[in-house]
Amino acid sequence: LAVQRDALLQQRGHAWLLQGPSGLGQFALGLSLVRAWLCDAPTAHGACGQCASCHVIDVHAHTDLCVLMPETQMLALGWPLPEKAQADIDDKKRKPSQEIRVDAMRDAVEFTQRTSGRGKGKAVLVYPAEQMNAITANALLKTLEEPPGDARFVLASEAAHQLLPTIRSRCL
């Protein structure tokens, strides 16, 4: 992962698509990239792992990072759900979603349009990206076509062929 991360950190652009078969560590690589971008004291090889920014990523609480996954996966990996989603699930109004919900994507798009809290820009990590349905993917597409200035996106996928061709074409 370190070699891939170092190579990707040299790239310029606002959207990356990390793809490969299951088990290669796409989420870990995506999170490593995001950590390096948001780190207060990055090294030539990525995030320092010691600063306040790295710490809040470790505890899943960075204000400039939005992680989008199916709710079932977020819960399994210990990532917090948006307040409304958590309230709906707690109140038994619905079960955790098995796909990335369109309202979560719309919230992420709105998130990218706000000012960075720590001055390093905003980052959105989507995993597994193939868990977006067409409506969710289209909610992301406009932002990929006209990205906010300091926002970066990482889409990590085990089945990139299932993504809309227009999504794939907007990513490095």
Give a label for each model feature.
Residues 113, 138-152:
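Conserved catalytic/switch belt of AAA+ P-loop NTPases
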Residues 127-129, 155-160:
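A short beta-strand-to-loop transition that corresponds to the Sensor-1 phosphate-sensing loop
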Residues 1-135:
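Clamp-loader machinery-focused feature within the broader ASCE/P-loop NTPase space
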Residues 118-123, 148-154:
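Loop/turn-to-beta-strand initiation segments
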Residues 166-172:
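A short helix-turn-beta junction within AAA+ P-loop NTPase domains corresponding to the substrate/partner-engaging
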Residues 131-132, 146, 162:
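Residues immediately C-terminal
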Residues 110, 142, 169:
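Conserved adenine-binding aromatic site and its adjacent loop/helix in ATP-hydrolyzing domains
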